[in-house]
Amino acid sequence: MERLEAFNPQRLQWCMTDAQIDIGHLANDVGISERTLARAIEGEIGLTFLQLQKLGKYFGRTPLFFLEEGTPEPQQIRSPQFRTLLNQQHNLDQKIKRIIQLAEWQREAYIDLLDELDAEDRIDFDPPDLTNATPISAARQARQWLEIGSEHTFEQFRSAIERRGILVFRANGYAGKWQIPSTHPTIGFSLYHSSYPIIVVRKESVEARQTFTLAHELGHLLLFRESTIDSVESLNSHARKERLANEFAGHFLIPQESLNQIDASSLSDEPEVLESQLQDFRRLWGVSTDTILIRLIASNRLEQAVYDDFKEWRGSRPAEQSAGGSREWRHREPKHILGDTYVRAVLQALDTNKLTLVKASKYLDDLKLTDIKRLERYYAGA
């Protein structure tokens, strides 16, 4: 295959420095020999288009990126939202950077799709002004704005949020470009835009955890109107914004009138008994025992020591494992990752010939054409 002499080694070096990866690890990850990459970086040879595709996929760039002249400037190739996250976490690894880029690309694709559809019912993101609101008041106003009633599952909260013009993406449980590994500290992030802001939540083996992350990221968007990235440590952080986002999430998921249903005086000090006593409430509200206990402590209805004992007991138990899943349901993955609102827009564009099958595949997480047909039948109820 022909080598492209227009290959710009400076751009590959920039990507490697940005990703904090050396040539040996890059060669192993992309399947190009270390010697070939070394010679290309030294300007001795060009690279083939297929090799540029591999590099582009790895770094979240197009093959043409490596053919352009000059060294890229961060402000030219990264959005202000992306740069905000990088300022918060200077050593953000390449896996998370690629997911941020992917989320931004999906947002742009969705907006372009709405233009193609000439959608008159485009949703305006017009949240209540919560600038000076307390977390309790903000959570109450947010529930009213989202018209939250008996919603208690992740998908129900997600649908309510999407109806108000926020894109909610959930990282995949399978290995792939959308996967945030369960061992990775990042649990989610939000990218603030005046229209169609983004929330990305890591898939968890326990749904209540990802539901809390969803509410936490919603708090960041509504309370502070800024982009942020969160790790497991964020949920225990005493930093002002993290603390307020956590309080918001707790009150959003468990309003005071719901919490009042619990007779705290009857709760046991024994962690295992306590877990059993709160089981019905966990299922009713779609939250974890931790969220309930923290709300009770904040309401001065439970001693901190009870929760400390519970955490110690929980930490001694084997971690819950996800069942994994079957690739037989690959055609439904775009709905789980991108959300029902997004997938319906793509299928509508496909049905009205506004989108080709090939382009629809790219919009739907590179779904194979046969799986797109299965997805269409699934939505048609066949």
Language model: regions and residue ranges:
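Active-site hotspot residues in diverse enzymes, especially metal/ion-binding acidic/histidine motifs
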Residues: 1-382
